[in-house]
Design a protein with these regions (language model features):
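Short glycine/serine/threonine-rich phosphate/pyrophosphate-binding segments
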Residues: 88-100, 120-122, 163, 189, ...
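Conserved small/polar residues in nucleotide/adenosyl-binding loops
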Residues: 225-234
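Gly/Ser/Thr-rich active-site loops/lids in small-molecule metabolic enzymes
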Residues: 196-213
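Phosphate/diphosphate-binding glycine-rich loops and adjacent basic-rich segments that engage nucleotide
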Residues: 141-198
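Acidic, glycine/proline-rich low-complexity segments that act as flexible tails and inter-domain linkers
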Residues: 1-91
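Hydrophobic alpha-helical segments, chiefly the membrane-spanning helices
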Residues: 236-242
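General beta-strand structural signal in soluble alpha/beta enzymes
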Residues: 110-114, 135-138, 153-155, 177-181, ...
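A glycine-rich phosphate/pyrophosphate-binding beta-strand-loop-alpha-helix module
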Residues: 44, 93-149
Length: 242
């Protein structure tokens, strides 16, 4: 298999994007731990230096979902995920978690996917843990929480066990890779709706384009500007087919 991946590395080093199928295959191989660490690191660095395309991000997201612990919710629940990419470096308030809890209190079914803090004062998991929330570890617990309260939080490490093979490589590289932006797109519950916040206009565009080819009913990608100008503070991108 590594011979095929070496060809993908050459493709990336030549500045050529991978197809969605190639990206999904690469993701599954990385998650299986079947790629030599040096080659895995080289592939991730080459992809980052080239710049991820929407097809590549979508392929990685689809592959990551396939190896995740499946959380199949009843269609009648029509859950929404309210999530942000993080990465703005502003050390700001965790907006997505507050919005998710408020939405659940207003009657929506929220299946929120997230992790601990990377760039903000507190990640979704940090905040919920401080409030005394207990993370579900199985799909049935997620279903029960949503039916009882309208809210459940899928703590990423509990539902993406295969990522243990990727974690050491990411830690060794110490640079941003495609995995830094996959979190919002890899909810194992496969929500019908998304409200996604991005840290830059480029990221908002990439996320919108990536979501437009995924199985969901509707998504809204938003970007908040903190300029003092009263005009154009908030911009949004709507995926054309989502």
């Amino acid at each position: 298999m590594n011979h095929g991946l070496e060809r993908l590395l050459g493709q990336l080093m030549n500045g050529e994007s991978l197809s969605e199928e190639q990206s999904e295959t690469l993701m599954i191989a990385l998650a299986a731990g079947s790629v030599e660490p040096a080659l895995a690191g080289a592939l991730l660095v080459a992809l980052s230096m080239k710049g991820e395309s929407a097809e590549e991000v979508r392929g990685f997201a689809n592959g990551m979902r396939k190896v995740a612990t499946e959380v199949k919710l009843d269609d009648s629940l029509e859950p929404i995920d309210i999530v942000g990419t993080g990465g703005d470096g502003s050390q700001s308030f965790n907006i997505s978690t507050g919005s998710a809890l408020l939405s659940a209190a207003c009657g929506l079914n929220v299946a929120k996917h997230g992790n601990r803090s990377v760039s903000s004062k507190s990640g979704s998991a940090d905040l919920l843990e401080f409030l005394g929330y207990r993370f579900p570890t199985e799909a049935d617990a997620v279903k029960t929480q949503i039916r009882k309260t309208g809210f459940s939080f899928l703590f990423a490490p509990n539902f993406h066990p295969a990522m243990k093979h990727v974690a050491p490589i990411r830690q060794a590289l110490k640079i941003r890779t495609v995995f830094n932006i996959l979190g919002p797109l890899t909810n194992p519950a496969k929500p019908s709706f998304y409200l996604l916040g991005a840290f830059s206009s480029e990221m908002a565009s990439l996320m919108a384009s990536s979501l437009s080819g995924m199985e969901l009913k509707r998504a809204f990608v938003c970007l908040l500007y903190t300029s003092p100008s009263p005009r154009d503070r908030t911009r949004s991108r709507m995926p054309s087919s989502a």
